[in-house]
């Protein structure tokens, strides 16, 4: 079932690398904050690297000015997400999250099968505005 406006963000664990590997509970991550969460089919893929992530990087100062945190998620491992962030010069504060097994993507109902391209199950392209665990309209 696909997430709808008014639904709570599902509780699963994601990974990210900062100083070291971190395991993050999505409810702990999105509780008591306003955030944009956007998903991409894959790090280093042409459209994600040339348009999707750069668009959010460009708008990041405006989100930050409004007190909105920004998170990018993909069904990739955390090492790939870290390398992609470095290659794209992602600014501090824009966080890249790894949904390596696609659990969060499936729980959101936003998975797609890219097996025909040799990529397996991936995230659809999406953006959600989250306010204290709830998917809302900004």
Predicted regions and their residues:
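N-proximal helix/coil linker or "cap" segments that precede and/or mark the start of modular domains
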Residues: 1-16
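Short loop/turn microsegments at loop-to-beta-strand junctions
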Residues: 10, 36, 124-125
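A short beta-strand-turn-helix
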Residues: 14-34
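Short active-site neighborhood of thiol/selenol oxidoreductases, capturing the structured segment around
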Residues: 29-49
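Conserved small/polar residues in nucleotide/adenosyl-binding loops
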Residues: 45, 135-138
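Structural microenvironment flanking redox-active thiols in thiol-disulfide oxidoreductases
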Residues: 49-89
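Short, internal strand/loop/helix patches
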Residues: 89-120
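A short, hydrophobic beta-strand/beta-hairpin element that forms part of a small beta-sheet core
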Residues: 125-134
């Amino acid at each position: 079932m696909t997430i709808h406006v008014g639904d709570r963000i599902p509780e699963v664990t994601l990974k990210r690398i900062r100083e070291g590997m971190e395991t993050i509970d999505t409810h702990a991550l999105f509780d008591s904050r306003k955030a944009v969460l956007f998903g991409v089919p894959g790090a280093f893929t042409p459209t994600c690297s040339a348009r999707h992530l750069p668009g959010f990087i460009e708008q990041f100062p405006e989100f930050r000015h409004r007190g909105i945190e920004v998170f990018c998620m993909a069904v990739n491992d955390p090492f790939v997400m870290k390398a992609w962030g470095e290659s794209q010069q992602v600014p501090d504060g824009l966080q890249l999250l790894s949904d390596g097994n696609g659990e969060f993507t499936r729980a959101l109902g936003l998975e797609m099968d890219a097996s025909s391209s040799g990529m397996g199950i991936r995230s659809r392209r999406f953006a959600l505005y989250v306010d204290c665990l709830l998917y809302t309209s900004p």
